[in-house]
Regions:
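Low-complexity, glycine/alanine/valine/leucine- and proline-rich hydrophobic stretches
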Residues: 426, 430-485, 491
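Beta-strand elements within well-structured catalytic alpha/beta cores of enzymes
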Residues: 9-21, 25, 40, 64, ...
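Acidic, His- and aromatic-enriched active-site or binding-groove loops in soluble protein domains
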Residues: 71-77, 128-158, 223-235, 281-300
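Short, solvent-exposed turn/loop segments enriched in Gly/Ser/Thr/Pro and often Arg
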Residues: 46-68, 115-125, 204-207, 266-272, ...
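Active-site-proximal N-terminal segment of extracellular/periplasmic enzymes that hydrolyze or transfer
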Residues: 1-46, 118, 500
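A long, amphipathic alpha-helix that forms part
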Residues: 6-7, 175-197, 201, 211, ...
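Active-site segment of extracytoplasmic enzymes that catalyze sulfate/phosphate-ester chemistry
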Residues: 39-92, 130-136, 141, 154-167, ...
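Secreted, luminal/periplasmic, and some membrane-associated catalytic domains
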Residues: 8, 17, 26, 32, ...
Length: 554
């Protein structure tokens, strides 16, 4: 397929590169290392793609698939708070409280193909085919629609793998695992493109995110964790992975009809980081979070637990000695819930990445009266914005948002009261911060090294539009991840639900190449009584292990 041969798009393909960032891509493009991506940039439009706040895959991919902000789709993290409780449970695709844009494509008679999109497990009966992505527990559950597709993939690949095993962060094992999974994702995409009809197709490659978290420092001499010997061994690993993706994209292009519009995107960007801020420890220092006295003491058991965790033995012992029901997110929620003295705690940082006021009539042990809420929240905001890292003398946060500043819709009340935005984009990784809500660091400073993380998510991902109907070589600014859903619907002449928050990116198209966007009065999302995500205990353990390995449940 060559660019701009056909003015009107007849089909759309989205290629997702989870975590891709122009900081990495631009130098490699200029050096000629990624010829396929360079071809797309030269022949299409490109620019940054603004993610959600927070720029976490759970929020971002849910906003991609629905075209709405988290206040409407209801996903605020990889976990969701159980109503009337301090506990959290894992979320999944069933937690999304509104319809995905491909549902509207299917209702319009267009066949869709969906491969490896995060937050699509459990699978749904789409008009076409689906293979679920991140958060799929494993190959022993239902992960595809129609069911015979699952059998086809298992026959073709044997064990079908959805994500890397993060029980180890050893570089060679991680690189090998990501390569094998990427090759499987590529081969699956090519198989489906060849054998099944589609008018809309998406494939998401998760390898960039998985590698960049742990290998970024080897590629960046400015990074405090950079080591010459390690860089000699692993400094080329990120480029080599992107070259594998570049070749995969070239193969995919070879299977696309001339009337295809291609959108290449990432759900967020990436940048180096070196520091960690234990926000619940800071709240404890301020007297806003209080632990029971037995939890506050750094006992022999606490020391031993931390040591076993650091050397990788804690999880093995837990699995060997404890019942399965204790080895899940429920266990971590229980530890947190029982460690905190809620009768004296006024605020806490939850697993969903935000701060919550311990409010009367909302939290089960709430002590903050409704008339105190606004003043306490503003006080907390001002004090946290003033916190500086003692090593860098730089603020920890760039902003601290009220819930209502970011989210609107029927589910907005379920969001945390305050959403912190840490330093992410400083060119010096030593200044960039990972927020951590765990209680493991109970007597230490709120500040520590970010190891094993050497990089974390940023707000701006990548966006390229190429192929049928695209305006030509230029940069486009202002695109947001919620804009992709209405843009895809408009390109295929399907009415856009009026409740969608995104806009049609009309500036990427040649004049007159797509019909005037039409809008429908589809019903706005509602709010169920409680969390909708549901895993069995065994499934929860499998998914939680991966998420903790990535640092997403700290």
């Amino acid at each position: 397929m060559e660019a701009a041969q056909v003015e009107k798009p007849g089909r759309v393909i989205v290629i997702g590169l989870d975590g891709a960032d122009w900081r990495l891509l631009q130098p490699w493009l200029h050096a000629g290392h990624l010829p396929t991506l360079a071809r797309l940039v030269r022949g299409g439009v490109h620019g940054p793609l603004r993610s959600t706040i927070r720029p976490e895959s759970s929020l971002a991919w849910s906003s991609f698939s629905t075209g709405v902000n988290p206040g409407k789709h209801g996903v605020f993290g990889f976990v969701e708070q159980v109503k009337g409780s301090y506990s959290f449970q894992l979320a999944n695709g069933a937690s999304i409280r509104t319809r995905r844009f491909w549902d509207f494509l299917g209702e319009a008679g267009l066949q869709v193909g969906l491969l490896n999109i995060p937050f699509t497990y459990p699978p749904s009966a789409v008009n076409g085919f689906m293979v679920t992505g991140m958060l799929t527990p494993g190959p022993d559950v239902d992960f595809a629609h129609p069911p015979e597709l699952q059998q086809q993939l298992l026959s073709r690949f044997g064990k079908y793998r959805f994500d890397v095993d993060h029980s180890t962060h050893e570089e060679v094992a991680l690189i090998d695992s990501v390569r094998m999974i990427t090759e499987q994702q590529r081969d699956t995409a090519l198989l489906l493109l060849r054998e099944r009809p589609w008018r809309f197709f998406t494939v998401v490659f998760t390898g960039p995110d998985r590698l960049q978290h742990f290998l970024w420092a080897h590629n960046d001499p400015r990074h405090p964790f950079y080591n010459v010997d390690s860089a000699r061994l692993f400094g080329s690993a990120l480029l080599e992975h992107y070259q594998l993706l570049d070749e995969a994209i070239a193969e995919i292009l070879g299977h696309l009809p001339p009337d295809t519009l291609l959108l290449l995107m990432s759900d967020h960007g990436f940048n180096g980081c070196a520091r960690r801020f234990y926000i619940n420890r800071w709240l404890q220092e301020c007297g806003l979070l209080v632990l029971h006295s037995t939890s506050a003491r750094r006992s022999w058991l606490t020391v031993m637990t931390s040591y076993l965790k650091s050397v990788g033995w804690l999880r093995r012992l837990k699995r060997a000695l404890l019942p399965a029901r204790w080895n899940s997110t429920s266990l971590h929620s229980a530890v947190f819930t029982h460690a905190v003295d809620w009768s004296r705690t006024r605020a806490y940082f939850g697993l969903d990445g935000g701060l919550r006021i311990n409010l009367e009539s909302r939290e089960p042990g709430g002590i903050v009266r409704a008339e105190e809420f606004d003043a306490l929240r503003e006080e907390l905001r001002q004090e946290l914005l003033a916190v500086e890292d003692p090593e860098t003398r730089q603020p920890v946060l760039t902003n601290l948002f009220y819930r209502e500043e970011l989210y609107h819709g029927p589910s907005a009340a379920r969001a945390p009261d305050l959403i912190p935005e840490p330093q992410r984009d400083n060119p010096d990784p030593a200044h960039n911060i990972v927020l951590d809500g765990s209680l493991d660091n109970i007597t230490a400073s709120p500040f520590a090294s970010s190891i094993p993380y050497t990089a974390n998510h940023t707000l701006d991902g990548v966006f390229i539009a190429w192929g049928a109907g695209v305006a030509g070589t230029r940069q486009v600014l202002g695109a947001q991840i919620v804009d992709l859903a209405p843009t895809i619907l408009a390109a295929l002449d399907v009415p856009i639900p009026a409740y969608m928050d995104g806009r049609v990116l009309s500036e990427i198209f040649l004049p007159g190449c797509i019909p005037e966007p039409r809008h429908s009065e589809a019903s706005e999302p509602g709010v169920p009584d409680g969390p909708e995500g549901s895993f069995s205990l065994a499934e929860e353990i499998a998914v939680e292990s991966r998420l903790r390995g990535l640092g997403y449940l700290d």
